[in-house]
Amino acid sequence: MDGSSFLDISLDLNTNPFSAKLPKKEVSVLASTHLKRKWLEQDESASELREELNRVNSENKKLTEMLARVCESYNELHNHLEKLQSRQSPEIEQTDIPIKKRKQDPDEFLGFPIGLSSGKTENSSSNEDHHHHHQQHEQKNQLLSCKRPVTDSFNKAKVSTVYVPTETSDTSLTVKDGFQWRKYGQKVTRDNPSPRAYFRCSFAPSCPVKKKVQRSAEDPSLLVATYEGTHNHLGPNASEGDATSQGGSSTVTLDLVNGCHRLALEKNERDNTMQEVLIQQMASSLTKDSKFTAALAAAISGRLMEQSRT
DNA sequence: CGATTTTGACCTGCGC
DNA sequence: GCGCAGGTCAAAATCG
């Protein structure tokens, strides 16, 4: 996927909405000194405003450049990752989306582009090889197996994995993704000392989405969130009904993760997971930058106001 | 007081 | 058939 296809870096941050409306210095004949003073005051504040706007404009430019750089490095990373993947597991390319069954051949699993299943080195000993395979199998099943009687629709439920960097001291096992979740279970699993938390979307039973969150055994600073299924509703911050309706609301909620998540779901399973990992990391680092989020919020609200005017 | 979380019990599928 | 492990349920506890 081309990074720039979902991130329009030509975004007009709209931080200069008044530039076209600045009063031209037409000298009119002012009859009284009172009026003259008033005009001088206005002129002064206008020049102050202009200065401020210039400053904001240059900041805007810097942000745009920053964004372009981020997209560039995203594309580089993505290409690099694809190259690595095609070199390491060419057979993977030919397989379809795996069915969630315990008997699933581990090699067919496509959901772990990074780390989790590659922490142990390959060993030529058949016994250990088997053991290694078994461990991989277990790890993968950990995130995929579903032993409940499943309906057809559930069987087709999309599974995606998201890695979220967190503080190692944070034991809450919460991943902020814009949706509201209700925890319904927690379990300690065999090959990971940290427990796994089970969440259902708060809109359940109408929304079938579930997620599992567990700290990565290999990198405790990472939370591994596994999503099953797709939301059949908007996020809690969105207006009800039509996703495209902006409804003239002046509130802008930055939900980069969610938006990208939805985009990624349109691709196949493997790409989906890869993209989400990268997107998640990008989004989390961007949303941590308060300046960026503020500027983006201003830009979006500016756009909305502009649209509502036209 | 309703919503949410916790946690032990129970269910289910799989391998032996 | 049995044991194991992951997933879910539901009563109790906690929170806002």
UniProtKB/Swiss-Prot annotation:
UniProt keyword list: DNA-binding, Nucleus, Transcription, Transcription regulation
Keyword DNA-binding included in the entry's annotation: yes
DNA-binding region of this protein: 170-236
SUPFAM superfamilies: WRKY DNA-binding domain
Principal location: nucleus
Subcellular location: Nucleus
Coiled coil: none
Transmembrane segments: none
Anything else known: Constitutive expression at high level causes severe abnormality in plant growth.
Protein known as: WRKY transcription factor 18
Function: Transcription factor. Interacts specifically with the W box (5'-(T)TGAC[CT]-3'), a frequently occurring elicitor-responsive cis-acting element. Positively modulates defense-related gene expression and disease resistance.
Organism: Arabidopsis thaliana (Mouse-ear cress)
A GO MF term: identical protein binding
Pfam families: WRKY (PF03106)
Induction: By salicylic acid and pathogens.
Gene Ontology CC terms: nucleus
Biological-process GO terms, alphabetical: defense response to bacterium; defense response to fungus; regulation of defense response; response to molecule of bacterial origin; response to salicylic acid
Keyword Nucleus attached: yes
Family: Belongs to the WRKY group II-a family.
Span list, region Disordered: 82-145, 230-250
